[in-house]
UniProtKB/Swiss-Prot annotation:
GO terms for cellular component: small ribosomal subunit. The keyword Ribosomal protein applies. Gene3D superfamilies: Ribosomal Protein S4 Delta 41, Chain A, domain 1, RNA-binding S4 domain. It comes from the Bacteria. GO terms for biological process: ribosomal small subunit biogenesis; translation. SMART domains: Ribosomal_S4, S4. It comes from Novosphingobium aromaticivorans (strain ATCC 700278 / DSM 12444 / CCUG 56034 / CIP 105152 / NBRC 16084 / F199). This is Small ribosomal subunit protein uS4. Residues 94-154 form the S4 RNA-binding domain. NCBIfam families: PRK05327.1, rpsD_bact. Belongs to the universal ribosomal protein uS4 family. GO terms for molecular function: rRNA binding; structural constituent of ribosome. One of the primary rRNA binding proteins, it binds directly to 16S rRNA where it nucleates assembly of the body of the 30S subunit.
Length: 203
């Protein structure tokens, strides 16, 4: 198992929050970070530390995308009209792997990325294996024939703690991305603070 693949299981513990709202999260059993020094008494966190943590939490939630990808997305958001934090959230929610996750075509964002990379997802009838692909309002995302029979899909759709948000219109084995959501519309299990992410990169 690669270090990057193994690290995903430590994201919740590192942040001390169950960022995906998973019943089996290790944070539900212990709230301190991973490693032998995880139980040390917490010291006062600086403004920089607070901003860094907000960035790590948001980046981690979206499948722990690389810093290069995340910063590039932020830079794009900062050049758009309107609030940069809101723009950042909108761009992240437009990722194909995230739309697949929101549609409950996969139980986790990591498995959603895998479903895309293995060629099981179609956008407007055309196969797409690029997880970071930008989905536009009106685009239809659907499952391939083989994917419809995968146990992974049935597992995801049976999860009671997750609902398909309003900006993803579900219709059987396909969904339509209806609009770019605002921060308040995104069903985060924990509080996200994109304004602090903006402050982090604006230093």
């Amino acid at each position: 198992m690669s270090k990057r693949k193994a690290s995903k299981y430590k994201i919740d513990r590192r942040l001390g929050e169950n960022i995906w709202g998973r019943p089996k999260s290790s944070v539900n059993r212990r709230s301190y970070g991973p490693g032998q020094h995880g139980q040390r008494r917490k010291s006062k966190v600086s403004d920089f530390g607070i901003q860094l943590r907000a960035k790590q939490k948001l980046k981690g939630y979206y499948g722990d995308v690389t810093e290069k990808q995340f910063k590039r997305t932020y830079q794009e958001a900062s050049k758009m009209k309107g609030d940069t934090g809101q723009n950042l959230i909108g761009l992240l929610e437009q990722r194909l792997d995230m739309v697949v996750y929101r549609a409950k075509f996969a139980p986790t964002i990591f498995s959603a990325r895998q479903v895309v990379s293995h060629g099981h997802i179609y956008v407007n009838g055309v196969k797409c294996n690029i997880a970071s692909r930008r989905v536009r309002p009106g685009d239809v995302v659907s499952l391939g024939k083989k994917a419809k029979e995968m146990a992974l899909i049935a597992e995801a759709q049976a999860l009671p703690e997750r609902e398909v948000p309003d900006y993803v219109a579900a219709d059987g084995d396909k969904v339509t991305f209806t609009r770019v959501p605002t921060l308040d519309e995104v069903p985060y299990p924990v509080k996200m603070e994109p304004n602090l992410v903006v402050e982090f990169y604006s230093r």
